[in-house]
Every structure is written in C-alpha cells, then in structure tokens.
Design a protein with these regions (language model features):
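Short, solvent-exposed loop/helix junctions and linker helices
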Residues: 16, 66, 105-108, 157, ...
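Residue-level marker for well-ordered alpha-helical positions
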Residues: 24, 70, 203, 267-268, ...
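C-terminal substrate-binding subdomain of Rossmann-fold SDR/epimerase-dehydratase oxidoreductases
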Residues: 32-33, 64, 209-350
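Residue-level detector of flexible, active-site-proximal loop/helix-junction positions
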Residues: 44, 68, 134, 189, ...
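Short, charged helix-to-loop "capping" segments that act as catalytic/coupling loops
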Residues: 45, 79, 119-126, 175-179, ...
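Residues in well-ordered alpha-helical elements
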Residues: 69-70, 82, 94, 101, ...
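NAD(P)-dependent short-chain dehydrogenase/reductase
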Residues: 139-144, 148, 156, 162-244, ...
C-alpha cells in the first residue's frame, strides 16, 4: 500500500466524470492518497449524489460538457495534470436508446475533444481512458472476452464505446507516439454504495425497498461481471502508474473484471438483495427487455500478468460491502465516513 501513497502523493490528476458514481469513489481515494485532483464533469444528475454527499476536497473543478471542445481544452490548460483519468461518459444502455445521438457525441466526440486537447498540450501526459466491458462483439457464447477479441456493439452505448476504443487507438498511432502515454481500460458491471443512477440493478432495488414496491427485471437470467467499484479503480491507478513509469511491454488495453468463476445472474442478486433490504419480491416484465446481451464475461488474466492486479472482492463479498454501505447510510450514517472506512479496509488488504 505504501507504493500507491508514494506514487500518487502530490500528483496533479485531471479526473473527468468526478461527479458520477465511480468518479466520486475515485476522487475520494485519490484525495486520501494525497493527489491534487482537478475535476471535469457535468453537475451530478442524481439526488442523492455521492459526489455531493462526500464533499471531497478538490484542487480545482470545472462543471462543463465534454462536447464543448473549448471547455475541455481550458480544463486541461488550467489543471496542468501529469495524469488524466477519463471516466466521463453517458454510461447507461437504456438511456442510449432514448438519446443515441447524445450518447455517441458524449462518448466518442467528447473523448476526441480530450485527445485533441492533449495533442496540442506542450507537456507529456499519461492517460487511462475508461471504456466498458461491452466493447466486444458479443455472440453470447459464454466465453470470457480477452483484450484481443473483436470490438463491436449492437446497442448505441456499447457501439459508442467500441468506437471510442478505435478513436483512442488512432490518436495514439497518429499523434502521440513517444510523447503521451495512453491506454484504455475495460471494466465490468461496477457496484458499490452510493450509486443512485437510473436503470441500474442495485440502485433500483434500494429505491424499491424505500417505496416497498417490487423491482422490475428485464432479463433475470442474464449474467454480468459484477465487481465492487474499488477493484477497477485500483486497476486504473495501477495502470496509470505503470504507464507513467514507461514500464516496458505494457498492453494498450486491459480488462478489469472478477474471477471467471464468479458468475451470478441478475435474478439471483435481486433475490438476495430484496431480502437484505426488506423489499417485496422482484417481478419479471419481458416487455421491458431492450435487447441487452444475456451473457457477458471478461478475461482479466492480462491485468494480472502485466500489473500484478487481481480483484480483491469475490462477488458475494462485493455485494455484502454494497449492502452494508446502503444500510448504514439509510440508518443515518455519514457517506464520507462509510466510504473512507471501505477504502481503508481495501488498502489494508493490498
């Protein structure tokens, strides 16, 4: 754990998407590590918002849209970062059907605006561009996707993230060779306390419990690579450190996901969590299905080989930590205290 503190203490970090769920956890951890975090994001769009509840001190902040190229360029100039962690995105599959153009412009054009700002930036930069486990052409064979699997995507969100991967590859090969160090990170379905996004399983269950209503499942038989938010964030930090040190032989992309034997269906998780939160039993409404893939798994062995990264949470432990956070917060606990406690426990295991 001392190594993380030694590397990140005093580092200037531009974190996009710091007002989102994963971004709020990352900002909190980076602050604890002593980094100077500059945030760039839209205002938090959920109420409650983990970002608002945590009140994490920032070295600077710009609330703006990635689709505003001038704002992105200004943020990079003002932050003068050594390292960029790019989380900001339209990250919900259902929302991508409602606004496909907005999803594509946010995810692809927004990332290109960041890449262009980097292209004209005078100093060398290290960047981890976060995409998703859904960038792969998924034939639902059940096999876990390695990083070499073909990219694809049927729904607008998945396709936009696959296109983002191609854009990053193009800018790296065309403009950044020998100057900036970039890589993409692909993580599975992230869970943890403090997520209140719409159309996500655990936030939907928490809301249903508060209303004493049944949560509606689109595909209860679907499996996903569930993982606690601290596992992929730890992976991103390790990846950024290795890139910054110019460690030889690093892959251009890495998967961060649970062990391959940790496959649990949506229905099984919903059954356990509705009981844990005292909510009515879930119900299945097939007409709500929007064509999402039923099987999805990541092969994260390359991250273990190249970074020494491995998930610290088994899936059940990730679910237990998530339930604990929400229960304590709903009982009046302080979100910052709860979050710091879980980060500290995670650090103790490193």
């Amino acid at each position: 754990m001392a190594g993380l503190h030694d590397f990140w203490r005093g580092r200037r970090v531009l974190l996009t998407g710091h007002t989102g769920f994963k971004g709020a956890w990352a900002a909190r951890w980076l602050h604890r590590l002593g980094a100077q975090v500059y945030g760039f994001a839209l205002p938090a769009d959920t109420d409650p918002s983990l970002h608002v509840l945590l009140h994490t001190p920032l070295a600077g902040e710009m609330l703006a849209d990635l689709r505003d190229a001038q704002a992105v360029s200004t943020a990079l100039r003002d932050a003068q970062p050594e390292i960029i962690l790019h989380f900001a995105a339209q990250a919900l599959v259902p929302a991508s059907y409602r606004d496909p153009v907005g999803t594509w412009t946010s995810n692809v054009l927004g990332t290109i605006h960041l890449l262009e700002a980097m292209r004209t930036h005078p100093q060398s930069l290290t960047a981890v561009i976060v995409t998703t486990d859904k960038v792969y052409a998924n034939n639902e064979s059940g096999a876990a996707f390695p990083e070499s699997a073909p990219l694809g995507g049927d729904d607008p969100y998945s396709a936009s993230k696959a296109a983002t991967e191609i854009a990053v590859h193009s800018w790296v090969k065309s403009f950044f060779s020998g100057r900036h160090r970039l890589a993409t990170a692909r993580a599975g379905n992230v869970i943890g306390g403090g997520d209140w996004s719409a159309d996500r399983l655990i936030p939907d269950i928490v809301r249903a419990a508060q209303r004493q209503d049944s949560v509606v499942l689109r595909r209860p038989e679907a499996t996903r690579p569930w993982q606690h938010v601290l596992d992929p964030v730890h992976g991103y930090l390790c990846y950024a450190e290795a890139l910054h040190a110019q460690r030889p032989g690093l892959p251009d992309s890495l998967n961060f996901g649970p062990l391959d034997d940790q496959r649990i269906t949506v229905g099984a998780i919903a059954t356990d969590l509705t009981k844990a939160f005292g909510a009515p039993a879930w119900r299945h409404e097939p007409q709500q299905d929007i064509g999402e893939k039923g099987v999805l798994a990541l092969d994260a062995r390359l991250a273990a080989q190249s970074l020494g990264w491995r998930p610290r949470f088994a899936t059940q432990a990730a679910l237990d930590a998530t339930v604990s956070w929400y229960r304590d917060w709903l009982s009046g606990g302080d979100a910052a205290v709860l979050t710091d406690r879980q980060i500290a426990a995670f650090e103790d295991g490193l």
